[in-house]
A protein has these predicted regions:
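Glycine-rich phosphate-binding loop
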Residues: 57
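NAD-dependent ADP-ribosyltransferases
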Residues: 60
Length: 82
């Protein structure tokens, strides 16, 4: 399983999300870290090099190395790319 790391701003982004949705996001991250499965898409343009995990109405923007996942943003889909 890959380690999951968070940028300093991410915990505060997760705290403002409804508890049920936040738990779903964390479960989806753990599932991806363990199995590599999930609704993931490689991004381009301004976000080139990042991946997006889709969890309901939320988007998790992260990058991945051989041993870790670093989460950069967790936002509602309408705000994720602004």
């Amino acid at each position: 399983m890959k380690a999951i790391r968070f940028e300093p701003s991410v915990p505060s982004e997760i705290r403002v999300i409804a508890q049920e949705a936040a738990l779903g996001i964390l479960k989806a991250l753990h599932r991806y870290a363990e199995t590599g499965q999930g609704r993931v898409k490689r991004l381009s343009g301004e976000y080139d090099g990042l991946l997006r995990l889709r969890v309901g109405n939320y988007r998790v923007l992260f990058d991945e190395s051989a041993d870790a996942i670093t989460v950069h943003r967790v936002r509602h889909r309408r705000d994720a790319y602004q």
